[in-house]
């Protein structure tokens, strides 16, 4: 009778270990996938940030948009107004 209980006990331990091993294996797999996805997300964010910095080939482009011919007549008036105290 003791041998039967011992065999059943060992079988129970083996089944429990097999289930927990599969659970642990699945959990490790999920953690690794999660870390990989987080790393990829961080790298894509870094690439997006770098592309924004590098993308602007002409940083003074907004200066060219100003219509200087329309603004030039007003410059003396602005200077005179700024010079008065």
Swiss-Prot record:
- Signal sequence segment: 1-18
Cite the entry's keywords alphabetically. Answer: Amidation, Antibiotic, Antimicrobial, Immunity, Innate immunity, Membrane, Secreted, Signal, Target cell membrane, Target membrane
The pro-peptide lies at: 19-57
Q: What is its main location?
A: secreted
Family recorded in the similarity comment: Belongs to the arminin family.
Q: Give the tissue specificity.
A: Expressed in entodermal epithelium along the body column.
Taxonomically, what lineage is the organism?
Eukaryota, Metazoa, Cnidaria, Hydrozoa, Hydroidolina
DNA-binding among keywords: no
Q: Where are the transmembrane segments?
A: none
Could you tell me which residues carry Alanine amide? Answer: 82
Q: Which GO terms describe its cellular component?
A: extracellular region
Purpose of the protein: Antimicrobial peptide with a broad-spectrum antimicrobial activity. Keeps its antibacterial activity under a wide range of salt concentrations that mimic physiological conditions of human blood, which is surprising, since Hydra is an obligate freshwater animal with nearly no salt tolerance. Does not affect red blood cells.
Protein known as: Arminin 2b
User: Where does this one sit in the cell?
Assistant: Secreted; Target cell membrane
Q: Which domain of life is it from?
A: Eukaryota
């Amino acid at each position: 009778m003791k041998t039967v209980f011992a065999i059943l006990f060992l079988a129970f331990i083996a089944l429990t270990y097999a289930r927990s091993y599969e659970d642990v294996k699945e959990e490790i797999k999920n953690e690794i996938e999660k870390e990989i996805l987080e790393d990829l997300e961080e790298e894509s964010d870094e690439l997006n940030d770098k592309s924004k910095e590098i993308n602007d080939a002409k940083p003074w482009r907004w200066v060219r948009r100003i219509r200087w011919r329309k603004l030039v007549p007003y410059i003396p008036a602005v200077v005179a107004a700024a010079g008065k105290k």
